[in-house]
A protein has these predicted regions:
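C-terminal regulatory/interaction module of P-loop NTP-utilizing enzymes
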Residues: 1-100, 105-241
Length: 241
């Protein structure tokens, strides 16, 4: 089997490909671009996210979305004669160094997905403003692999980067025998945000040349729940380049 080094442009080995995705996952977390990791149940999606949080020295708040009901994203009450939505405790525990991990997100019913749009897109839970530097990561199974699974609605799917997680048999066997090494995340250097304007110039130059790629709405249910180009997703790219 060919082992590709870090300079290889076209990796054909499963291990190298998984390392690339792992780095993209960590990059999304550090640039505060929401990211969702897709894969079958039981392959270690949660453990990978926990390892990245440890490596980046971030506090991790985990929520299992399959157990959510609408009150978990804002409990409606009357306070001082006004209607308000109270945020749950986990939302109050978030700070600028928090990684919020939403597990089993594809098991979230459409009604709750609609409420979660504010968490993912606006950093808001109920009437509580979440920290603007809060990082959000999710995991999901395909609808046919999840108990009570749902496809993501197009507006939700467009608010995140989608990564497919795979299982490499050789790596699993090695880990079972010799132990699984903790995954290290490469940290961004200081000043990365100052480079965003130059990246925007690069992206807009591409769109001027190929304007048909600025927006391509999904045409069927199968594609609406995954990544698709929009002004929002191009803005994400400017943070990730």
């Amino acid at each position: 089997m060919c082992r590709c080094n870090r300079y290889t442009r076209w990796p054909i080995d499963g291990l190298v490909l998984s390392e690339v995705k792992r780095n993209v996952n960590a990059l999304c977390i550090q640039t505060r671009v929401p990211v969702i990791l897709w894969g079958p149940p039981g392959i270690g999606k949660t453990m990978r996210t926990q390892a990245i949080a440890r490596s980046l020295k971030m506090s991790l708040i985990e929520q299992v979305c399959s157990t959510w009901d609408p009150t978990d994203v804002g409990l409606p009450v009357i306070s001082n004669g006004q209607f308000v939505r109270l945020a749950p405790k986990w939302a109050h525990d978030c700070d600028d160094n928090t990684l919020l991990y939403l597990d089993e997100f594809s098991c979230t019913p459409p009604a709750i997905q609609a409420s979660a749009l504010k968490i993912v897109g606006e950093r808001k839970c109920g009437d509580l403003a979440l920290p603007l530097r809060l990082s959000i990561a999710m995991s999901a199974n395909r609808a046919d692999q999840a108990a009570g699974g749902w496809d993501l609605a197009a507006p939700m799917a467009n608010r995140m980067v989608h990564l497919d997680s795979s299982l490499v048999t050789e790596d699993w066997c090695d880990g079972m025998i010799g132990g699984f090494p903790d995954q290290k995340a490469e940290k961004l250097g200081k000043g990365w945000e100052a480079l965003i304007p130059a990246k925007r110039a690069l992206v807009t130059s591409f769109i001027r040349r190929f304007p048909q790629h600025l927006l391509a709405l999904p045409e069927d249910e199968e594609t609406q729940g995954r990544t698709w180009p929009s002004p929002r997703s191009w803005d994400f790219l400017c943070r990730l380049l």
